[in-house]
Amino acid sequence: MTKYRLSDESRSFSYQDNGNKKSVLLRQIIALTDFNDVQAGTPGGWIDNESVLSQSGDCWIYDENALAFSGATITGNARITQASVVRDGAQISDDVWIDRAEISHNAQIRDNVTIQDSVVRGECLLFGDALVMCDSEIIAARGLTRESDQLLQIYDRAFVSHSRVVHQAQIYGDAKINYAFIEHRAEVFDFAQVEGNEENNVWICDCAKVYGYARVIAGSEEDAIPTLRYSSQVAEHAVVEGNCVLKHHVLVGGHAQLRGGPLQLDRPHPD
């Protein structure tokens, strides 16, 4: 089935990529037949090549301000809405919804993932029912650690909002991340909650982990920024809140509560 054609008219689009100015020639998609909620004759977004948008399935670029180009692929029943940009080898498939977001540089988005008002860039994998929204930035970078092949992943029912998740971090299970900076090989999973606010983010880096039903919460006061570094862990039903810094080999578990601060726990030479 051929469900769309490209417009006769074209437009040039200029953009910055790693500090370099580039341009691409785009043509608009126009539906040839009725499918899903799209009617024949409806114009959609702009692409540089028919290989970008599959002629099979119900996938569609809905907004006339949305663009997809430079080796990107959109397949299955994926929906691209509002002024989104999908480019540079990004792969969007299955029942993914991309809404006013930018996806680029070989990012893979699958299953039922929703990305709204956010940026996803680099070699990463988002799948399951994950939700990324509210000006979040997912910036993958491999080769910075000994696990050079590890991909940044967000999956299962993970929820990320107002946050930066970078490098090779892992967010999964039913984890909820709000106003946080998660980097390196840090992991947040199970039913863990990481809760920053407009004043202070939570910072989790290196190989730190938050899991179980643990909560790490930022305060609104100056420096009320919980920081987990190195191999520190917050697990089970523990709560860490405020100006608390956890470093080497520290495990806060059970129903322990660390609040207020300034407080620093470090165990550089474990028994």
Locations of regions flagged by a protein language model:
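Short, flexible active-site-proximal loops enriched in glycine and acidic residues
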Residues: 73
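Extended, highly charged clamp/arch subdomains and adjacent linkers
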Residues: 84
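Intrinsically disordered, low-complexity Ser/Thr- and acidic-rich flexible linkers and loops
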Residues: 144-149, 219-225
